């Protein structure tokens, strides 16, 4: 499931993040690449351990923790600290698949990459190109979202970023280990939760059907979750 999650950051928060990011020192994006990605990746990136990356990453994680739609869709168990990249002057990232396990350098913190996320930090009209293209059995899905919005998709997906031919594309990217590892199971839970919320808004939280469906949701989560 590929999902657009709007409003993770406000316009003011995006501006604060960009002020810090634009003043930071960036390095070749292959600093974090696997063997396959290094052949396809042409961009710049903040070093993982930089104070700016940590500060902006913490702000993003705080925002994610408050975002109900993100939690419902991802059911996060662990979130890899957000990383940051930028593309300009024809820079691109060819077709690749993300590594299954991400290790935070200098620590024993590991994340199984069930989900990949890109949080856009530049407005779509600020650059040409730079679309995130995610492939699945139904074709290629493209994302170029407003600043502050996030796209979430299975980390097992082949994906690429088209060349940026004007302006600059700035984004954060990171991976999530979900409590529910299977994408199909996780999608069913998200769909069920969405319907429960809609029914609750219509009939009230004390409605017998809402209570029954909520019980089914939690029993399925209990069956499938690792916590």
UniProtKB/Swiss-Prot annotation:
* Positions of the Fe2OG dioxygenase domain: 78-178
One Pfam family for this entry, by name? Answer: 2OG-FeII_Oxy_3
User: Per the annotation, how and in what number is the cofactor bound?
Assistant: Binds 1 Fe(2+) ion per subunit.
User: Which biological process, per GO, is one annotated for this protein?
Assistant: DNA damage response
Q: Which domain of life is it from?
A: Bacteria
Matching PANTHER family: PKHD-TYPE HYDROXYLASE YBIX
Q: What is the protein's name according to its record? A: PKHD-type hydroxylase BamMC406_4714
Q: Which organism is it from?
A: Burkholderia ambifaria (strain MC40-6)
